[in-house]
Amino acid sequence: MMLKPEGLKLIDENGRRLDGRKKYELRPIKMKVGVLKNANGSAYIEWGKNKIIAAVYGPREIHPKHLQRPDRAILRVRYNMAPFSVEERKKPGPDRRSIEISKVIRGALEPALILEMFPRTAIDVFIEVLQADAGTRVAGITAASLALADAGIPMRDLVAACSAGKIEGEIVLDLNKEEDNYGEADVPVAIMPIKNDITLLQMDGYLTKEEFIEAVKLAIKGAKAVYQKQREALKEKYLKIAQEVEGSEQ
């Protein structure tokens, strides 16, 4: 959160935000599954101006062997922002923020996976941010969950994520870059919608108890809308496969 430039209004008198959205409106979201041929599973997401690709490899052998778990697979997540993903070109390779977000995403995804089915193996998730525009962790979680499903990893549920926040004293859904920079708070949430479980809940900034509850409820509502888009993306891929199979049989 940064000091807001004088005269900048994040919401106008008609309740419209800088990008024209209403308070409770998501940015445009597009998802595609199975975008990388060499990965076991993959997904691509455009969320506002965010462009993120996720790839899953595994279950596969772990080296060195002392990292193996005899009772379950281990989930390894690497979140990385490409040097060209932000306006000020960043140094290549993982920084402290990327390492922290990798851990956060792993914690959000792990409850959904049935890791006990693959003892002594690893499931590797790579998330590459090609273009960043606020909310990369929730978009990354959403894409990674799709890629895991695409890889055929047994899951209790998909994980869908969204954030809410506070700008100009108002609770709003899905902050964009300016709102994230100059707003008062950001609350990213990840859920397993069918099980109704929260797998990630964070807060950056300050909210009263009432505002926090309102923001969490709004983020959950947003995540449920994201979940429907995840389902559509998976259906689209497998309907296409079914059509190809039918076509080859004729």
Curated annotation (Swiss-Prot):
Q: What is its EC number?
A: 3.1.13.-
Name of the molecule in the record:
Exosome complex component Rrp41
Recorded name of the encoding gene: rrp41
Origin species: Pyrococcus furiosus (strain ATCC 43587 / DSM 3638 / JCM 8422 / Vc1)
Q: What are its GO biological-process terms?
A: gene expression; rRNA catabolic process
**Primary location recorded for the protein, binned into one broad class:** cytoplasm
Quick check: keyword Cell wall biogenesis/degradation in the entry? no
Q: What does this protein do?
A: Catalytic component of the exosome, which is a complex involved in RNA degradation. Has 3'->5' exoribonuclease activity. Can also synthesize heteromeric RNA-tails.
One Gene Ontology MF term: RNA binding
Q: PANTHER family per the record?
A: EXOSOME COMPLEX COMPONENT, EXOSOME COMPLEX COMPONENT RRP41
Check the record and name the CDD domains matching this protein.
RNase_PH_archRRP41
> Subunit arrangement?
Component of the archaeal exosome complex. Forms a hexameric ring-like arrangement composed of 3 Rrp41-Rrp42 heterodimers. The hexameric ring associates with a trimer of Rrp4 and/or Csl4 subunits.
Give its localization.
Cytoplasm
Quote the InterPro entries the UniProt record gives.
ExoRNase_PH_dom1 (IPR001247), ExoRNase_PH_dom2 (IPR015847), ExoRNase_PH_dom2_sf (IPR036345), PNPase/RNase_PH_dom_sf (IPR027408), Ribosomal_Su5_D2-typ_SF (IPR020568), RNase_PH (IPR050080), Rrp41 (IPR011807)
